[in-house]
């Protein structure tokens, strides 16, 4: 696995196309966000979709990747039917530009694939092709990855490679417990990488409830795991969310003035105020992705 990562570093550092990309946009950085959760049913995908739309409404170039490889449903919320996914790129059947879908909500969408982890076993030539294809995403301002729920291996790969990780939970005791469990696994398995973890509390009835839940988790994480987790914000429990799911129209589009939409805008605004540090965007993502078995 480490050999594959080293090969990819060489390929991405020395190919003419990658050199041109650096020269053309040396100051451009792609922010890569992974949105995850300890359990299903907490609204993780809804958060990913609507955050992507909120970024697009700010004038950002946004790509949303469905990384929930077992129960992919981003396309359901967007009401699109993807004909191709990342597996066709991995198998060199399609180019990246051929699988990216434009959507009516202003974002681009890439469907995931159950075999995505196969890139760890690609030959040098196959890695070269995939690296060049994936590097095309470097023109985006924001890439949001909706991971699967829980601690599957591919979830940890996405978490390890992203610039920032947002763990979604709700006020339910089981969701809080599972959020802590997810953070524990991340810090145990990937602690040496100093993953940038933030909490997003969904379906709250007040700002105070969101803060109380986040404080509880952050305190326990600090006490028992000796790890710093930040609170990024909350989203109100509101009937417009379930109604938008039924209509397959994100609430940022159909109810832009609703409480949940305002919450998402506030969260995105807070994210935008944080520095990306030394991240190299898409190139850095691929290198880190291959390091995690």
What function would you assign to each model-found segment?
Residues 170-171, 197-211, 234-241, 256:
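G-domain G4 guanine-recognition motif of GTPases
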């Amino acid at each position: 696995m480490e050999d594959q990562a080293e090969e990819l570093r060489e390929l991405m550092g020395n190919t003419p196309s990658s050199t041109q990309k650096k020269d053309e946009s040396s100051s451009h950085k792609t922010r890569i966000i992974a949105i995850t959760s300890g359990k299903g049913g907490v609204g993780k995908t809804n958060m990913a979709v609507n955050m992507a739309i909120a970024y697009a409404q700010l004038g950002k170039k946004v790509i949303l990747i469905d990384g929930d490889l077992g129960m992919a449903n981003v396309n359901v919320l967007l009401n699109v039917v993807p004909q191709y996914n990342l597996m066709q790129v991995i198998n060199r059947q399609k180019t990246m530009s051929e699988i990216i879908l434009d959507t009516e909500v202003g974002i681009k969408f890439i469907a995931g694939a159950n075999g995505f982890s196969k890139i760890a076993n690609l030959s040098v030539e196959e890695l070269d092709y995939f690296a060049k294809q994936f590097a095309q995403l470097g023109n985006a301002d924001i890439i949001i990855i909706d991971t699967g729920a829980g601690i599957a291996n591919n979830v940890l790969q996405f978490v390890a490679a992203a610039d920032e990780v947002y763990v979604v939970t709700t006020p339910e005791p089981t969701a809080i417990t599972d959020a802590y469990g997810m953070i524990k696994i991340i810090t145990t398995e990937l602690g040496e990488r100093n993953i940038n973890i933030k909490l997003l509390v969904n379906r709250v009835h007040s700002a105070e409830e969101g803060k109380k839940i986040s404080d509880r988790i952050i305190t326990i994480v600090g006490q028992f795991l000796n790890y710093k987790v930040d609170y990024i914000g909350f989203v109100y429990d509101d009937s417009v969310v379930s109604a938008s799911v039924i209509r397959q129209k994100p609430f940022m589009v159909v109810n832009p003035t609703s409480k949940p939409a305002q919450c998402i805008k506030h969260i995105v605004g807070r994210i935008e105020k944080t520095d990306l540090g030394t991240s190299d965007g898409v190139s850095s993502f691929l290198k880190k992705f291959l390091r995690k078995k």
